[in-house]
């Protein structure tokens, strides 16, 4: 047992001795008060006897005057004794209140002394039978299998940096609050009584419990369902105090603190896997693009031409929970009468309808706008359940005036049964070619395509133009395309389009921008500006985070293409719900759990079975695991992350506990309420 724990136990014994002394004083005061009551009654009897004696000896004047003087003296003494007695009774009441408060302090001190004894393995301190204490022992924490010493020491190192902490309302006078930074030093420990656990210690203990729960089956949900959660937090506090004390002694003997790595810095992603190294037949990426899970009886539908830029058209519209970019394929299942009636009404072979995105925030100057895309149906097939499978492709960006919508807008993924029409306007796509490529150099043009001469040819072109180098470089996008190609090489994608307009939309889908950047690129009419926005994101490393609890799930560097359309594709399940799916080789260790049983029915990838995966931290659905059921099929296992359940974020957002700060803060609020 260390010195600090011994001092606390001595303090406990001292407090118990003070309690006994105060109780003895209280008993003495009570006896004194009783004696004063007896004296007061005797004093009250003496005046009555004097009055009776004066009545019988009325002839003796001297005795009457003496009796009157005695009565006056006794009355004065009686008043003085009564005042003194009332003061003593008031002092006894105050002593009772002080003793009651001291009993509460002794209860907490005895509880902590018992916990210190149990942690030290020397048994419990004998308790006073008159003191009510909590006899429930703290629940044991399963630390051995996860390496408690290493985890606790690592948590202490991580928590040395400022972080948000929580504290109960009784600590409102301290610097530690729900939204203020905390520290792991002992500067704030003296601001509260010694029996009270400082807020920074509670924060550190909850962080460790969350980290341990993350590495076990059930995740945070199991942690909250377990009994004696508050006792587990207290036990973790004392365990970390012991480890912190040993670490401090080691630091004083040898300067080894600087050699501990800082896990809060941005961690580099692991090297990407190479699926070509796996033995077996490489999966045909053309199969998912065909959406063969709809069946083989799909018929081609004649297409229509692109609509003129700036023109306005009245068409059937639906809503969609994801943002589609031109070139993406949208499979869906709907009542066939809606589309068939549309073909009969328009008298055209092909069908074009609009898809709006409520996720897109309208500009401040016109909040009644809704952005979306036009989609063309190119294949359909019967499902046998009064629904028809359709495959459509997004063509052009549109803007919808909400005041012109006729009918209730319905989501295309929820089996709409009613029609909704509106006027839509086709948005333009402006593209300015590179200025130097517009210069005709005559016979020197033959050197343009020679790699060894391109740089010299470019410098020669710059000398013939009135524009500065910065102006020419502002509209150049070749270096952006080259950087994007190098970054996408690890994803095994070789279907990069050459048209700049299509290329800009294709890069947005395959480079995985944040939602804010996706909105910005969609609202941009200039292809050049769109490519420049994409270029600013090429140097960032990103992760997939759970949208519900912000837990890190997978690195974007592990993305790969299981479809010829790229790493992100829209798929439709048997219920008609459309999922935006991102395929990755692997997920972060201890990041997911499983729900239900695996199945091969309606599999998006022929030859693979799917199994629902959930976030291990919050138990929410985040995607599927696909495992090969056919022999010699590569990759053997991969994962599909649902776009509606994950978000893209920078690697610097990843926390040491692999979870979000608000989860820990909610646990701290729970602990604070229990401590109160």
UniProtKB/Swiss-Prot annotation:
Q: List keywords of the entry alphabetically.
A: Metal-binding, Nucleus, Ubl conjugation, Ubl conjugation pathway, Zinc
InterPro entries, from UniProt? CULT, Lon_prtase_N, Yippee/Mis18/Cereblon
Task: List every stretch annotated Disordered.
Answer: 1-78, 118-194, 249-276
According to its UniProt entry, the protein's GO biological process terms are: positive regulation of neuromuscular synaptic transmission; positive regulation of Wnt signaling pathway; protein ubiquitination
Task: Provide a GO CC annotation, any one.
Answer: nucleus
Regions of biased composition (Polar residues) lie at: 156-177
Start and end of every CULT domain? 541-650
Compositional bias per record (Acidic residues), positions renumbered to this chain: 1-11
Q: Which family does it belong to?
A: Belongs to the CRBN family.
Source organism of the structure: Drosophila mojavensis (Fruit fly)
Q: What is this protein called?
A: Protein cereblon
Recorded GO MF terms: metal ion binding
Feature: compositional bias, Low complexity: 12-33, 125-139
Designated gene of the protein: ohgt
> According to its UniProt record, in which pathway does this protein act?
Protein modification; protein ubiquitination
Q: Does the keyword Lyase apply?
A: no
Could you tell me the superkingdom of the organism this chain comes from? Eukaryota
Q: Where does Zn(2+) bind?
A: 546, 549, 615, 618
Does the record carry Ubl conjugation as a key word? yes
| Its job | Substrate recognition component of a DCX (DDB1-CUL4-X-box) E3 protein ligase complex that mediates the ubiquitination and subsequent proteasomal degradation of target proteins. Has an essential role in mediating growth by negatively regulating insulin signaling. It also has a role in maintaining presynaptic function in the neuromuscular junction synapses of third-instar larvae.
Assembly mode = Likely a component of a DCX (DDB1-CUL4-X-box) protein ligase complex. May interact with pic/DDB1.
Q: Where is the Lon N-terminal domain?
A: 314-542
Where found? Nucleus
